[in-house]
Amino acid sequence: MHANEMRECAHDDLVEHVQNIVDKFCDERITEDRIRQWRISRGVPEAEYRAFYESELGKYCLPPMAGGFDGPFIARAALVARLMRRAGATMPYLTDMNSMALLSTMRILSQQEIAEDLMSCNGRVAFSQAFSEGGQGESGSVTTEVTVDEGGIFLDGVKTFVANGQYIPRTLVYTRDMVNGTADGGVSLWLVPIDEPGVSTFPLNTVGQEMLAPARIEFEHVKLNPDWQIQTEGKLSQMLERQYELGRILICASSLGLAQAAMDDVLERCATHVSHGRNLGGIPQIQQKVADMAVRVRAMDMLVTRAAESISNGADADQQHLDCALMKYYVPKAATEVASEALQIFGGVGYTDDARVGRIWRDCRGNQIAQGTDEIMPHTVAKMLIKNCASRLVDF
């Protein structure tokens, strides 16, 4: 057996193990009534976080230096997909997974310092990510700014769509910084406590993904402690590029799980529901929709697995970029289409809270925007494919 085949077998066993422990946790902790309540309350109770971190699942949201899982990234993608499938909703543990992904891109000393600080704070290595700004599509056009005067270092600006921004004690702020960020082209990262004077948080009433509790955070001349700056040593651009790829895998794994949940609900309804004296699953038009949905779900699974394995196996950087871009271009949109067809098959009840498919559609739709919109992915895909072709022609 070749090395790649051995890795694939090992990954298959690991994925199956992760899926089993997710199923066990969901059987014990997650019900449809609880999901509905948590959506209304914009998050899960603290007791549920404790239960998650005390279970075997908790180690997948922790870095190795904090006792977390030290293995291929595909295991974390499998966890996200299975959890979203079982819940039929976007669970807030996704924020913790994104924190872990971003932390893994930092230098080891920074990882250790941040992990120790956060673990002592609330037992979780989690921070919100204050990167997005209203109307600012490119990170290079960020307007949040760090300034320095005789009184110290100060932060001013507004960030939006900060997942769990009101509830996680620290937020990682991406900002213009012409003094401390010169090595990175005038930008820097700061891990800021949200209870500091001058920090204000406000809820965002999004149409989906309620348990992520998105927020707007305003920084009004917040005095910064120099120790809060993340030391990037001129490698911030590479760090963020890596984080985007890991984050996109997690987002697409979430989309995959949501689409699988919609498919599960459709198959059950087709097998049990009778319409005008006919079994729903026996109607040719419904069969066509089910077949189309199955193809999309299968393709999504393949793309997510390919991208996650590319990262896990340490493929060359260009291959990782291509696999992640192809995945992000296709998966979120396909998930939304699957959920939309599920809603159509359910009919009127699908447009109410009596069925999960409506909220699944709303959650899927948000993932077409998160971690890079659908529209920007073709640029990366085409560029990488043409580059690979040009390289082969030169070698030939």
List PLM regions with ranges.
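A short, Trp-centered hydrophobic/proline-enriched beta-strand micro-motif
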Residues: 123-132, 173
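A short core secondary-structure module
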Residues: 156-202
